[in-house]
Amino acid sequence: MVAEKPKAAAKIAYALSDGRGVLRCSEYGVPYWIVRRDGAAIVVAPSAGHLFGPHTDSRGFPVFDFEWRPIFEFDRGAGYLSKFYRMLSRILPGASLYVNACDYDIEGSVIGFKIIEAFGDVNRARRMKFSTLAPQDIRRAYARMERLDVEMIEAGMARSEMDWLWGINVSRALMEAARRAAGRRVILSAGRVQSPTLVEAYRRWREINLHVPKASVAVKITAEKGGGVFDARPHGWKPQSLETARSIKSELRKNPWLAVEEVRSERSILRPPPAFNLGDLQKEANRILGLPPLRTQSIAEELYLEALISYPRTNSQKLPPSINYRAILDKLAHGPLGREARELLKETGGVLRPVQGSKDDPAHPAIHPTGEKPSQRLSKEHMAVYELIVRRFLAAFSREAIVSKSSVLLRDFQGRVWRAEGLRVEDLGWLKYYHYSTPGEKPMPPLDRGDKARVVRVDVRVEWSQTPVRLDKASLLRWMESVNIGTEGTRARIIETLYKRGYLEGSRKSEVTPLGEAVAVIIQTLFPELSKPDLTRRFESMIEDIRSGRRTRQEVIDMSKKTISKLLESFLDRLDTAVREIGVSLGSVEVEAACHLCGRKAVSAVSGYRLCSHHMEAFDRLRKALPNLASTISSTPREALEAIARGRSRAGAWVRDVAALALRDDGLYKALL
């Protein structure tokens, strides 16, 4: 029996032993376990993830010949795999039956299959399918073993082979372009999913740095009635300038009374959220705990190996009726969230009907707790993610939350209408369990039509619009999900690869590095088809077709080779004309004229200052926006530029650069007007 990792192998062995003797053995320093069940001796042996992968000895590109070989033979960082290889090669031959007990996904299917193919006999092989490592689930999977999941194996092998073909050919092509441009070897990497993700990061980074904020004037009044205080804002109108807003403030100081014209209230229902899939968990852990997506995924996988939660790499938001939820809640009632579990059982009377989300996964249900107790004390981070999963699971069985919203329209002595809003949670419902989504209450004093309220404070301020895009790990993950590239289990790893390669940097807010900018520009120049998600998404769909039996692996690999060949032909056609630009992007070719502000290649000059394409676009955007900015904040253009140059305006870095330079140079200042 082949397990994906040593910890999983141990859990499987002890589950199958029914508490009887488990013999722990070791070969080449790698543990494996022997148990007896139903009169048979079962050897549970672990791998350490993928033991085999595609490789070639061919040089240059295009390269389409490869074979599956032990990864440690060609990857210097995978030397630790050799001891697993030797252990498996020693104990697998000669068994009467082979069982793939790796995780039930396309990666696990390939890991187990390649090991059995290398050291055993795939004609005497079976597949165990389980979603948790809890003892009862392992025993059930053992009793219901099926034939090898050939479609999953073929889909997994196709993905590995396809990603290898794209990665090696495009990376070698990029390095050849860099070698010709720079006159030296430059290590660059690209990939079917990695490349469009990098280009999207570059696009977002440019938009953030080119952002010219819009200014608006906000007026907020604080009013009082019968000892109760509330806030109100303009309704159906807004001050067009700072000067107008200040005038309104002065008027309301002299005549501070407002008449209540309309009072409305309504009750809203907040439906419980479904249990997590991996993407939802990663986004919520980032929002609530500040964890990067890959860290959340790693923690969830460790919780799974501890048998505390179900398999996390799932796209499903559904909890099927086949799971014994009452048994899980009974166990949770004696754990760290026992009070909440007991409360839910009391609330539902034991009738457990979970909310179902729209997304499904044929292999696994939504992430849920098993109710098992940890074998060791959990770290603070592990406990926080575990609590998030348990609370979301409990919320899925709870009733709807009810909130009461009130809206009040008031009129001042000049006839201007103001709107006040209140919110009160009437019934917490599922929010008792998943409090992270509880809306903030805004109390409103009792108000009736005709009542008078007195203005006690008027706040006037300039608000600057934020850039419409973000660049961090969580926002890239959301983008990959929205365009359907990558898988639940690979997206966070691909994003992390962009940081490890030195293309992106920063944690909470990310930046594209000079190397990342160069690679993104080269991909857009030489592989424009690979800079968009369409091509990647099309091949993702083909993988699903293999999994569902609509296509064969060979069909998809042949199509990949054909597409790569066409891309490389276009690449070679474009290469000669792009060599110099690539050298400039890599910083290996000295530019004839450098940007005054950043040293990049200048594309134009304004008032004697040479500017690169980034700063030139920033100049153009700022010039178009400046008159309206000055008018809104009731200032001169110079004062508006001073506001832009300060960080508080939320202007992009390149826009601030141009504004600061214009404030120092009258010629550039006049060019902006």
UniProtKB/Swiss-Prot annotation:
Its cofactor is Mg(2+). It catalyses: ATP-independent breakage of single-stranded DNA, followed by passage and rejoining. Keywords: DNA-binding, Isomerase, Magnesium, Metal-binding, Topoisomerase, Zinc, Zinc-finger. A zinc finger (C4-type) spans 595-615. Mg(2+) binds at residues 4, 103. Residues 352-374 are annotated as: Disordered. Residues 189-194 are annotated as: Interaction with DNA. Residues 149-568 form the Topo IA-type catalytic domain. GO terms for molecular function: DNA binding; DNA topoisomerase type I (single strand cut, ATP-independent) activity; zinc ion binding. The record marks 55, 159, 163, 313, 501 as: Interaction with DNA. Residues 1-134 form the Toprim domain. The active site is at 311 (o-(5'-phospho-dna)-tyrosine intermediate). Its EC number is 5.6.2.1. The keyword Metal-binding applies. One of its GO terms (biological process) is DNA recombination. HAMAP family: Topoisom_1_prok. Monomer. Belongs to the type IA topoisomerase family. Releases the supercoiling and torsional tension of DNA, which is introduced during the DNA replication and transcription, by transiently cleaving and rejoining one strand of the DNA duplex. Introduces a single-strand break via transesterification at a target site in duplex DNA. The scissile phosphodiester is attacked by the catalytic tyrosine of the enzyme, resulting in the formation of a DNA-(5'-phosphotyrosyl)-enzyme intermediate and the expulsion of a 3'-OH DNA strand. The free DNA strand then undergoes passage around the unbroken strand, thus removing DNA supercoils. This is DNA topoisomerase 1. It comes from Aeropyrum pernix (strain ATCC 700893 / DSM 11879 / JCM 9820 / NBRC 100138 / K1).
